[in-house]
Each structure stands twice: as structure tokens, then as C-alpha cells.
Amino acid sequence: SSKTGAYSASISYLNKEGILRNTDHESYNIRLKSDYSFLNNRLTIGQSMIVRLAQGKGNIDQDTMFGILQFPSVVPVYDPTNATGWGTSANINLPNPLGYSNVIDNTNESTRIFLNAYLQAEIIKDLKYKFNVGIRKDHTKSRTYTGIYDLGTFGKNDAPDLKEGSSTYDSWVIENTLNYDKVFGKHNISLLAGYSAQKDKHYGLNGSNSDIPQFIETMTGNTTTMSASSNLKELALVSLFGRVMYSYDDRYLFSASIRRDGSSRFGKGHQYGSFPSVSVGWNINREKFFNPLENVFDQLKIRASYGKLGNQEIGDNYYPTISVVGSGMNYLQGNNIWFGQMPYVNAVSPTNLTWENTETYNIGLDLSLLNGRLTMTADAYV
């Protein structure tokens, strides 16, 4: 037996100063890749990994840009008579752009990891098995600290405010496939069968507080203004699929496939959908009766196909079949009004929601003349 392999590694660093103040960005990128073959290339394995670390500041928002474009240039940037030191204008409801960008400290950090690995084995001659796995992990953090300021008619902040947030995204996908490819005589056949599964998970946590003690940049102080929230979303998808392709002498072409997908977006009894497709083609220029024109026609092919597609995407809604119930509706009990005690339905979703189906019929013509000097493709869809 023999063994061969190849690998590579790289690292890059980026430090970019923003055009405007407090918009710097810094990132590291690491890439690793390797492939190995064993048993005279009957067994191959490989992996690739990308790690990206980034951090930066992002203090520019709509108010800052309006301030840069419209704030009067005759107003001084600094004003020693102002308690917070920034020049203001009483005639325009816009912030001093430099002052506004300096009193708000907005930082972001992110870590992203992408990992892919595969194994391919030739079980017997012409029959191959392949396993793929992909993993992605994202983690981001954001922090916005707003200091004390007095920016005239735009507003003032007598005590610091703080917002912090973090989010994670975890995703994995696995795929198993069997491929059989065989050529015998003028016959060419290719078979594929496979199974795949994937899962995505999003989690976010956010907190904020206002009027916190100066110089203590943590979520402490005024408990009456402290707030926190979190969110969690999960999505799973499983698929079975198969395909057969056949051609005879590259004259008569046939292909058929089917896949069955199941999505966690839909309720029990409506999670699965089947999506077939079939196509046929005829290369007329390869027929014997076409030989007198072979110096003129490079290709004359007619084809027809039918396919059924499924769509599970409903915006960013991972739970479209779950109704949302809230509270806060007032009602009368005896002579007393009970405020916000009665539950009510915010949104009612259909329980029989399922895959969106689209069917397409197609006929087409491919034409090539005079060694490719003139080509034409025509398609009609129903």
C-alpha cells in the first residue's frame, strides 16, 4: 500500500484604522488544510479549518452622520463653559459629531470557527462511500457605554448608561453518500443515494441599565432601570435523496432524482415533503442519419424536464406553527378592574402549515454550428 498527503497552514493579521474616529477594526485569520490518501488512493481523508478573531469599534450611527453633514461649522468643537466640554448649537437638533462619538464607547468582539472534514472509501470497484461533516461556531459580544454629556438641544445625559449583549450560533451538518459509476460498452450509468442531517441553534442574551455610577462600568447601580432579555431559536432538517443518470452512446440521456426532506419548522404530520424530478435528452447530431451534416452541426440537442421543488423558508420564523400568547388585557371582575391580568392571543398560526411546493415543466433546444462559431439555447417553462 502507499500513502500520500498534503497540508497547508496560513495566518493573516489586519489592523485597519477607520476613516472616522473610533471606527478601528482588528482581526486575525487562521487557516489549516490537510488531505491524505491510503491504500493506493482507495481511502482518502481530509479536513479544513478556519478561525477568525475580530474586534473593533463602531460608534457611527445615523445621528453622527447627520451631525457631520449638517452641524454648523461656526460652532466650536470644544466649549469650556459647557460642563462636559463640548460645543453646542441652540438652533439645530443635532449633536456635536466629535462630542457624540467620544461619549459613546461601542465595542464589538467576535470569534468564528469553521471546521469541515471528510472520509471517502472505495468499497468495491466503481462503488464509493463518502462521509462529510461541517461544524460552525460563532460567538459575538457587544458593549455600548454612554457617558455623561450635554449636547444642547440634542439632549443631555446626567449619568452613564450601559448596554451589553452576547450571542452564540452553533451549527452542524453531516452527509453520507454512496456513488456507483459504471461504463460498459456504450452505456454509462451513475447512481447516488444519500442521507443528510443538520441543526442550527441561535442564543442571545442582552442587558441594559441607565443612570449607573460613574467610573463603575458594570451593570450595577439603579436596579429600577435594569433590564435583561434572552432568546433561543433552533432548527433541524433531515433529508433522504437519490439519483439515477443514464446515457447511451451520449445520444439518449435520462436522469431522475427524488428527495424527501423533514423540517422542524412544521407541526407533527406536516414536517415531511417529497420532491421528485426527471429529465430526458436526445443528441440528434449523434444519429447516423445526421452524418451528412456533421461538418455543420456540432450539437443539436432537444430536452425536456419536470421538477418539484420545496421551500421551508418563512422569513426568520423558526416556529411558524406556534401561536403566541401574551398577557396585559384588562377585565372587570365585580366592581373591580383587573389591569393586565387576562391572557390573550397575539398571533394565531395554522397548525397544518407545511412545505411550499413549486412544479416546473421545461422543454429546451441546444444548438451549436460551425465549430462553435454560432450557438443558441432556447427554453420554455410552464
Identify the function of each model-found stretch.
Residues Q62-L98:
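Acidic, glycine-rich flexible loop segments
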Residues L151-T153:
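Intrinsically disordered, compositionally biased low-complexity regions
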